[in-house]
From Swiss-Prot:
Protein name as it appears in the record: Succinate--CoA ligase [ADP-forming] subunit beta
Source superkingdom: Bacteria
Keyword Nucleotidyltransferase: no
Organism of derivation: Hydrogenobaculum sp. (strain Y04AAS1)
GO molecular function, one term: ATP binding
Protein's pathway: Carbohydrate metabolism; tricarboxylic acid cycle; succinate from succinyl-CoA (ligase route): step 1/1
């Protein structure tokens, strides 16, 4: 679950972390009220969307008067802001108005989970303000990595090591890293990114930007944070899928995918790409999907106007092939299927599943294996 910058900063402020004074504004009137509350100019106005690289896309501006604030707010609120990370753009429905911070030096700092060694990874760099993806390509040696054992927690020697590598006061920076680590753990975050973290001209350290992402699997432990989620930043089909406990992520291709199991879903998308096509989504119906869930999954899948063909790839284990077939038959009663559907079934009750589909009268194309299914789906989508 992604949070807006202003929400992330409010959470981090509770841990005693230094963030600029600021207010969220949903319209021009609130933007002006925020400016008045902050005591004047210059101010920084930031578009609040769930995408990085906002500054390069014109989503961040320093304003020095009421006129500039009003003009920028009117120009960007309600508009779609496209960035490198979000080429299709996101609607700007709110702004963050902050006091401008006098910057001496910018740094990068993030905390995430490194699954390869089951440790918490802290990344830092003197190259603040750059996207970490760009930095890893252009200057990989500029990224400092420190691994933390979650059982032991972050140790004093690790905060000192990071401080010395960045050339920052160990006492001041060490406390900030420790508090950020505590916030990361308490919030069940999957990512906590500060870019940039800045050293001011007065020698203070300030979190100039903040991104917090909460692990969806732990959201039930944070009902107050769950309520902060801005569904306007999420694709409507993803919101719909979440209601039925489906793992759905919209992509840019035209081959719809329905698969059971995340690993098989990833493999299916890879095979579609290998065969020269492009998947339109990630959709894992899971092992214990009911007939109703399968029907809703198919309905959501075919609601995407970009989908020109569907590849259903099921290996029946916990999710039996006959149950999947019944779900598809139920979905066909609800959805007027106008696009080609390719089905590959293997595993538990596969013959029963194939028989049900054959006797249903549905015009589904059968595939003998994944490669055959991918090729057929791509051909039918043309």
């Amino acid at each position: 679950m992604k949070l807006h910058e202003h929400q992330s900063k409010e959470l981090l402020k509770k841990y005693g972390l230094p963030v600029p004074e600021g207010y969220a504004a949903f319209n021009v009137k609130e933007a002006k009220e925020a400016a008045q509350a902050l005591g004047g100019y210059p101010l920084v106005v930031k578009a609040q969307i769930h995408c990085g690289a906002r500054g390069k896309a014109g989503g961040v501006k320093i304003v020095k008067s009421d006129e500039e604030l009003e003009a920028f707010s009117e120009a960007i609120l309600g508009k779609i802001l496209k960035t490198v990370q979000c080429p299709n753009g996101k609607v700007v429905s709110r702004l963050l108005i902050e006091k401008a911070t006098p910057i001496e030096k910018e740094f990068y700092l993030s905390i995430t989970l490194d699954r390869s060694n089951s440790k918490i990874l802290i990344m830092a760099s003197k190259e603040g303000g750059m996207e970490i993806e760009e930095l890893s390509k252009e200057k990989p040696d500029a990224i400092i990595k420190e691994y933390v054992d979650p059982v032991l927690g972050i140790m004093p020697y690790q905060t000192r090591k990071l401080s010395f590598a960045l050339g920052l006061n160990p006492s001041l920076f060490g406390k900030i890293v420790s508090k950020l680590y505590q916030a990361y753990m308490d919030l069940d975050a999957s990512l906590l990114e500060i870019n940039p973290l800045v050293l001011t001209k007065d020698g203070d350290i300030v979190l100039l930007d903040a991104k917090v992402e909460i692990d969806d699997n732990a959201a039930f432990r944070h009902k107050d944070i769950e309520e902060l989620e801005d569904i306007t930043q999420i694709d409507p089909l993803e919101v719909e899928a979440k209601k039925y406990g489906l793992n759905y992520i919209k992509l840019e291709g035209n081959i719809g995918c329905m698969v059971n199991g995340a690993g098989l879903a990833m493999t299916t998308m890879d095979i579609i790409k290998l065969a020269g096509g492009a998947p339109a989504n990630f959709l894992d119906v899971g092992g214990g999907a009911s007939v109703e869930q399968i029907a809703n999954a198919f309905r959501i899948l075919t609601s995407d106007e970009n989908v020109k063909a569907v590849f259903i790839n099921i290996f029946g284990g916990i999710l039996r092939c006959d149950r999947l077939a019944n779900g598809l038959i139920e979905a066909a009663k609800i959805v007027n299927i106008k696009i080609p559907v390719v089905v590959r079934l293997e595993g538990t009750n596969v013959e029963e599943g194939r028989k049900l589909l054959k006797e249903s009268g549905l015009n589904f194309e059968s595939a003998v294996d994944m490669w055959d299914g991918a090729q057929k789906a791509i051909k039918l989508a043309q």
